[in-house]
């Protein structure tokens, strides 16, 4: 078996996690109490969904997941929510006091008290696996727990499970919408360790997803639930090939191989199509070519950056539902002819495709329409650097005046860590600039228009 363990850290990680597990359960026909009427092999057969669920002797399916937060309120919602019987109580770990939006509290003072307990739980889950493939880590880097405890856990996982791949689904601060003043500090400090300790990180940002909800689903005032349901579709499409049998299956380690040209250049953009409301879907059927095109639309990206400002290095298209390889090849060929979608010249092919015959599932009463086919794209584009340069700029404005720094130093951090993390990010921006530059063959037609 190729099991994956999901780790949900902090409020964002947990709430995205709730949406994901709700969707997985619906997709596999698992009831909220973990029973699965359709499962014929009792006691942990070799079914594909056993990559994400372990099975007890009593036929109950338990997610291979850990939820961690430094304060109890969000996890208490899981403990009392609709899926409370799904999880083992030991999988839900909460502390008593929160990280107060402070990276240093999450990473040093409070985080360090809880991290061993988390690793112990993760170890139990890992021992329960026959061939652990890797970890999916969900967190946000704006707050204190997601950024601080998130990076602490990643660092410790690198020590304990050095060879296993780690995929991060990371919510980054949005350009306009902010939930805390010190977001830029937390993000920069956290990205510093994401650079070292994740193999692939998929960037999400709330503002981009708000806009998708508003524009494509006509939701005037999207809530976090709306956002998370959309994110869970993306994550479900990514992991579908691990949980179902398909024609062109994609492994977690395959993402890494196909998307990451250099170890540091591993921050991905994601998009999903079709995002349409039930009213609209009733009247139209979308072809493979149409959904592929809309996945490449800048407005479909789940992070606020414009792929037209950069170049693609690689991209992974995961189709599900009624899709055949012939349609996919035709759609990809069309994309390659478009002038707006530019690839770096050292990566001529750049597409990895996966097909899964399980059609997309929707949450009853959710916003998305039930469709026959969908595509999720994860792409590695140099335009991601925009996300970092925005955060760096905000970081610089505050750090120049050393604003709020005492809160971090008071929790046992050293001021040198700020500048070290900031330099690391400056180097990352430089790396992106270099991979996007034309290779030295004297052909510099594209250099004039590149703006960074």
Swiss-Prot record:
Its main location: cytoplasm. The lineage of its organism: Eukaryota, Viridiplantae, Streptophyta, Embryophyta, Tracheophyta. GTP binds at residues 11, 71, 144-145, 179, 206, 228. The modification N6-acetyllysine is found at residue 40. Mg(2+) binds at residue 71. Undergoes a tyrosination/detyrosination cycle, the cyclic removal and re-addition of a C-terminal tyrosine residue by the enzymes tubulin tyrosine carboxypeptidase (TTCP) and tubulin tyrosine ligase (TTL), respectively. The keyword ATP-binding does not apply. GO terms for cellular component: cytoplasm; microtubule. Residues 431-452 have a biased composition (Acidic residues). It catalyses: GTP + H2O = GDP + phosphate + H(+). It comes from Pisum sativum. The record marks 452 as: Involved in polymerization. Belongs to the tubulin family. The active site is at residue 254. PROSITE patterns: TUBULIN (PS00227). InterPro entries: Alpha_tubulin (IPR002452), Tub_FtsZ_C (IPR008280), Tubulin (IPR000217), Tubulin/FtsZ-like_C (IPR037103), Tubulin/FtsZ_2-layer-sand-dom (IPR018316), Tubulin/FtsZ_GTPase_sf (IPR036525), Tubulin_C (IPR023123), Tubulin_CS (IPR017975). Tubulin is the major constituent of microtubules, a cylinder consisting of laterally associated linear protofilaments composed of alpha- and beta-tubulin heterodimers. Microtubules grow by the addition of GTP-tubulin dimers to the microtubule end, where a stabilizing cap forms. Below the cap, tubulin dimers are in GDP-bound state, owing to GTPase activity of alpha-tubulin. Its EC number is 3.6.5.-. It is found in: Cytoplasm, Cytoskeleton. CDD domains: alpha_tubulin. Its cofactor is Mg(2+). The gene is TUBA1. One of its GO terms (molecular function) is hydrolase activity. SMART domains: Tubulin, Tubulin_C. Dimer of alpha and beta chains. A typical microtubule is a hollow water-filled tube with an outer diameter of 25 nm and an inner diameter of 15 nM. Alpha-beta heterodimers associate head-to-tail to form protofilaments running lengthwise along the microtubule wall with the beta-tubulin subunit facing the microtubule plus end conferring a structural polarity. Microtubules usually have 13 protofilaments but different protofilament numbers can be found in some organisms and specialized cells. GO terms for biological process: microtubule-based process. Keywords: Acetylation, Cytoplasm, Cytoskeleton, GTP-binding, Hydrolase, Magnesium, Metal-binding, Microtubule, Nucleotide-binding. This is Tubulin alpha-1 chain. Residues 430-452 are annotated as: Disordered.
């Amino acid at each position: 078996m190729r099991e994956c363990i999901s780790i949900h850290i902090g409020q964002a990680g947990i709430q995205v996690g709730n949406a994901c597990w709700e969707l997985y359960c619906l997709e596999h026909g698992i009831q909220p109490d973990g029973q699965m009427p359709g499962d014929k092999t009792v006691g942990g057969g070799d079914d594909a969904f056993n990559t994400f669920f372990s099975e007890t002797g009593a036929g109950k399916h338990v997610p291979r997941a850990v939820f961690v937060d430094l304060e109890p309120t969000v996890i208490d919602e899981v403990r009392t929510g609709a899926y409370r019987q799904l999880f083992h109580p030991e999988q839900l770990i909460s502390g008593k006091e929160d990280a107060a939006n402070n990276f240093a509290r999450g990473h040093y003072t409070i985080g360090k008290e809880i991290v061993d307990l988390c690793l112990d739980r993760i170890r139990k889950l890992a021992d329960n696996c026959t061939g652990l493939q890797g970890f999916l880590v969900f967190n946000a880097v704006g707050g204190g727990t997601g950024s601080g405890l998130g990076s602490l856990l990643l660092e410790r996982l690198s020590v304990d499970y050095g060879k296993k791949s780690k995929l991060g689904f990371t919510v980054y601060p949005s350009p306009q919408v902010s939930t805390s003043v010190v977001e830029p500090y937390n993000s920069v400090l956290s990205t510093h360790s994401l650079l070292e300790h994740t193999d692939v990180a998929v960037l999400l940002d709330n503002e981009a997803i708000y806009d998708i909800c508003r524009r494509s689903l006509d939701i005037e005032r999207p809530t976090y639930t709306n956002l998370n349901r959309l994110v869970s579709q993306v994550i479900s499409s990514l992991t579908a090939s691990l949980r179902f049998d398909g024609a062109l299956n994609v492994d977690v380690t395959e993402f890494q191989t196909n998307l990451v040209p250099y170890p540091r250049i591993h921050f991905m953009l994601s998009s999903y199509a079709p995002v349409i409301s039930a009213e609209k879907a009733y009247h139209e059927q979308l072809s493979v070519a149409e959904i592929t095109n809309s996945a490449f639309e800048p407005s479909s990206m789940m992070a606020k950056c414009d792929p037209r400002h950069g170049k693609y290095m690689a991209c992974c298209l995961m189709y599900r539902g009624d899709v055949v390889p012939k349609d996919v090849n035709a759609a990809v060929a069309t994309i390659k002819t478009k002038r707006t979608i530019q690839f770096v010249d050292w990566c001529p092919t750049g597409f990895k495709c996966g097909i899964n015959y399980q059609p997309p599932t929707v949450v009853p009463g959710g916003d998305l329409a039930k469709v026959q086919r969908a595509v999720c794209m994860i792409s590695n584009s140099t335009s991601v650097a925009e996300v970092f340069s925005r955060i760096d700029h905000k970081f610089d404005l505050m750090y120049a005046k050393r604003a709020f720094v005492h809160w971090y130093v008071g929790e046992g951090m050293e001021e040198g860590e700020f500048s070290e993390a900031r330099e690391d990010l400056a180097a990352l921006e430089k790396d992106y600039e270099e991979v996007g530059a034309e290779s030295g063959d004297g052909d510099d037609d594209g250099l004039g228009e590149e703006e960074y």
